[in-house]
Amino acid sequence: MSAGDAVCTGWLVKSPPERKLQRYAWRKRWFVLRRGRMSGNPDVLEYYRNKHSSKPIRVIDLSECAVWKHVGPSFVRKEFQNNFVFIVKTTSRTFYLVAKTEQEMQVWVHSISQVCNLGHLEDGADSMESLSYTPSSLQPSSASSLLTAHAASSSLPRDDPNTNAVATEETRSESELLFLPDYLVLSNCETGRLHHTSLPTRCDSWSNSDRSLEQASFDDVFVDCLQPLPSSHLVHPSCHGSGAQEVPSSRPQAALIWSREINGPPRDHLSSSPLLESSLSSTIQVDKNQGSLPCGAKELDIMSNTPPPRPPKPSHLSERRQEEWSTHSGSKKPECTLVPRRISLSGLDNMRTWKADVEGQSLRHRDKRLSLNLPCRFSPMYPTASASIEDSYVPMSPQAGASGLGPHCSPDDYIPMNSGSISSPLPELPANLEPPPVNRDLKPQRKSRPPPLDLRNLSIIREHASLTRTRTVPCSRTSFLSPERNGINSARFFANPVSREDEESYIEMEEHRTASSLSSGALTWTKKFSLDYLALDFNSASPAPMQQKLLLSEEQRVDYVQVDEQKTQALQSTKQEWTDERQSKV
């Protein structure tokens, strides 16, 4: 905002939020009151950290605010109890501001209140102007509508009491409707009570302002708003002698009824508007049987006791409707007129249902009657108030179906839902009829099971023992060992029976080494073939190599070990010394 928008500036002490009045500090800030009405901006109260700050700490919107001096209990801090405190309350927060002097406080209060009140006045003027700026074809100004109604009422003959009462009601209701002081014409206002015998009964949910709009619209004001309505929404008087009594219709809010003759002298003021005459004449329909009904009888009661008529042929539906409209509008005098009302928010819910029926009536009747072949409500035999009854009404009892079907009806035009009245056109099937046989082999995607395998001609597989390679010593043990060594080995063999297999392997290697030292030329093959391999066993049925070793005899079993001579000699000497020590202790 520019500096020219500033109305008042100065230092004020600002309060913290209301929940923190006693705990938090009150800060001194530089306040600027700006009025942005001339530039199109809202009225705000800004406060800065100091006088030279460019960005405000907070902007307080004064569109909905109130300002007053603080008078009452001293709930502010002690250091500000004797100061001049005023309150600015907005929709979001309440600000307690402390001024230095009383004059400064008066200036701030006056400036803020002037900005707030002026803003409210301008907002109200803008809202009123937005209402009066609507197109004149839809909503003319209130003064012009009032003058038009007054001129129309003055042009009417004075000998008609109903017309005078209508004009009086229009003038009085217009004065109730106009709430703007600039557009209220007091010279045309009249006071008094409404005579209920002059106008027909209306729905209580409509307000007086709504009624004044509809009555003013009759006098050539809302001419372009008139549109022909279907005959199902007309309400006819039940007795010719009384104009105030009328038969209740399905939607009384959809039309405004004027119970007076249209072709008489009161029609003089409508002669200047051919559009209005054509609109009114197109919406007139008088029922032929309506005059024969007793006073107070309701059309809904008659329809509830009478079955629906036979519907016309689908091809002649549109022709019969046109003939019916032309016959009713041209042959008889109209007894009542239909003026569509201008619906406000109070009657918006009722207007939605009425508008949906007006727009989709032709499509709904054509589709439903052609598809369901149900009775149509455009028959001249019954009143048009049958619109309140369900479209798809069908008698569910045999009596109603029989009475609805006269001698002139054919069963192809109207078929009731009762199966007992009309036999089925389909021929009956014999009781002993069986379905045709089905070839099970022709089913698609049927897979046959493969034949089982024949294992009778196969020969029996015999399991062979695995081939093992054994090695025997060509000479006996005792031929190379002295009697002393033999005794020592036998004693060691029986002393440690747990490690018998290990002992045996080392004894055997020792014998080989002794034999090689005695006759190196004869037994050179022992060193060359010191490592041997077992044959691979591919037969799973044969016993495992470990199990086969256990089954062999002790002399045939050979352990294949690659021996380190130095380690073996050291181990043998250690075992020898250990055995000697144990024997000496015994």
UniProtKB/Swiss-Prot annotation:
CDD domains: PH_Gab3 (cd13385)
Gene Ontology annotations for the cellular component aspect, listed alphabetically: cytoplasm
Keyword S-adenosyl-L-methionine: no
Keyword Phosphoprotein: yes
Chain spans, region Disordered: 149-171, 281-335, 401-453
SUPFAM superfamilies: PH domain-like
Biased composition (Basic and acidic residues): 316-326
All residue ranges annotated as the PH domain in the record: 5-117
Source organism, top-level taxon: Eukaryota
Molecular functions per Gene Ontology: signaling adaptor activity
Comp. bias intervals (Polar residues): 283-292
UniProt KW keywords: Phosphoprotein
Phosphoserine: residues bearing it: 344, 482
PTM summary: Phosphorylated on tyrosine residue(s) after macrophage colony-stimulating factor (M-CSF) receptor stimulation.
Record-level GO BP terms: macrophage differentiation; signal transduction
Family to which the UniProt record says this protein belongs: Belongs to the GAB family.
Quaternary organization: Interacts with PIK3R/p85, SHP2 and GRAP2/MONA. May interact with Grb2.
Protein name stated in the entry: GRB2-associated-binding protein 3
Gene, per the UniProt record: GAB3
